[in-house]
Amino acid sequence: MNFSRKFLIGLPYVWLLVLFLVPFLIVFKIALSDYAISIPPYAPTLELANGWQGIVDLISGLDFENFVFLLDDDLYWKAYLSSVQIAATATVLTLLVGFPIAYGMVNAPDEWRPSLMMLVILPFWTSFLIRVYAWIGLLSNEGLLNSFLLWLGVISEPLIILNTNIAVYIGIVYTYLPFMILPIYASLEKLDASLLEAAQDLGCTRIGAFWSVTVHLAKPGIIAGCFLVFIPALGEVVIPSLLGGSRTLMIGKVLWEEFFSNRDWTVASAVAIILLLILVIPIVLFQRNEQKQREAGK
């Protein structure tokens, strides 16, 4: 194997080492440190300047005080559970919205597909913050939605949507909808229409054929889309902060407040480590699913 090939193969590992493993070790080091009124606001238990003796001192005096604190304070585990619940619910809602859109795009005339694909990708051309702030203008008590419903006479007083979990769901679904549509579209595009006809010829109803053929063959895209939505939604900060307000409890908000408001880097690092461990579960499941799909395709 020549040097250039080794270099190309090693690039992803160097990328992971520099941008994942090293930052993870730094955060883990802070999580094992003690809080201190200083800059930075922690007293490290590992001093690299001491060499091996520093590592020995760390192991001998190792304690997980910050992790124990997270278990004792119900705010944190409630935030984890709330984040999982909100992310899972938003993922299901995104699937319910995204699948019909992807299905419609696949069945649209060929000359329409590039334009429809452009409409799906178009929101990425604008700032994420601007898009979230736009929803504040839509969902507030004096926003466009309430003004329109009041004008129609559908409601007699403004609906309270902003600063609720409903607004958070709307924001997450809108933001991550393309991540659901695109993998489902990629799976449905490979579907042979003759399979549906064959299923109906064998006695399946249209609904039965749709479920047994279309949905089944789109399963890889559905699974990929669900993971692509659930994983970032679990640690979301901006959407619950701007659309959910103080009423929405998510671990991303708690992590932000610990770092920048309370300046308790040690507890915040412990929160981040546990969040990362939670995220490893869907990532591993996603990789196993991808491996099964590759093996099935051989």
List each model region and its residues.
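Transmembrane alpha-helices
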Residues: L11, L122, Y174, M180-S194, ...
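Membrane-interfacial helix termini and adjacent extracytoplasmic/periplasmic loops
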Residues: G54-I55, V132-V173, I207, L243-R247
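Short membrane-interfacial helix/loop motifs at transmembrane-helix boundaries
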Residues: V22-D74, G245, K298
